[in-house]
Amino acid sequence: MLEELIPGVRTLTADDLGIGTRARAEAGHASSAPDAPEIGADHPRVQEIIRLAGIFGGVILSGPPGTSKSFFAAAAAQALANGEKSRYRFVQFHASYQYEDFMLGFTPEEGGFRFKEGPFLKLVLDACEKPDATYVLVIDELSRADVGRVFGEALTYVERSKRELPFNIANGREIKVPSNLIILATMNPFDRGVDEVDAAFERRFAKISMDPNREVLAELLDENGMDEALRDRVLHWFNRINGYARKNPAAAVGHAYFSAATDEESLRDIWDYQLKYLVQRAFRRDENTRTDLETAWDHIFPAALDPEPAPGPGATPGAPSAET
């Protein structure tokens, strides 16, 4: 259904979020979509985004992976557009994303080529036709692309003070960025393109820091039915690594990494296939801290907390047990 409404744009589904409860929804760290979020317009964070969007015309949610950026952008977009799917669009930037994808490109047809409107231009034109309605563009992974090249001449005119001023796009057509178009974007502050994004948007849009949230994680683990003692040990490790992240921001771990955590087995999977690599990368030049975090993770599990039983009479120290 959504694909029919916004052809040519990569849409993102609720399955990407892994939502199922309010806490799980807040923890959704994958790219979000406009499919009935469980956080409503009355959520304080959504209200903050809406308020700032009205002042600046655009809001950037900036934070490490797993901090619910995309989900809150999606929830705010729905609220701003009163749930009308034709009034909001989602795009995801990447390293090869260009002006031709976003604003105006060419598409082949019999006998030559014709201009093809990108998602930004389409939404601009729609918003101009209905100035009393709010339209929203959500850009996921803003810092993954060369934003100056992607926005082109429009970069100047997304600024609130320059809305409604006419300018020409690549085919010579005169357009304007209307005041009723809101731009919401997400970005990872540790991406390579962050400096360019900051330079382009720091005067134009508001920015909200999205940080790892212990309270959201605690609620999420409770909703998942995790044993209280195990949950507390996970929270202790979560605090520990994010404490290190104050000096090494690349080590930040968002609460959404634990969205599927229910028991010891699921925690081991999260470590073996995700967190282990994050810790190794963040502390590849700091073996002491890396070892400390690995040891602290092992102590989440009760078996690591119990002292090794003394060998029985006649047993040879270090010899394998009968069960091995």
Q: Which residue ranges define each predicted feature?
A:
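C-terminal regulatory/interaction module of P-loop NTP-utilizing enzymes
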Residues: 1-324
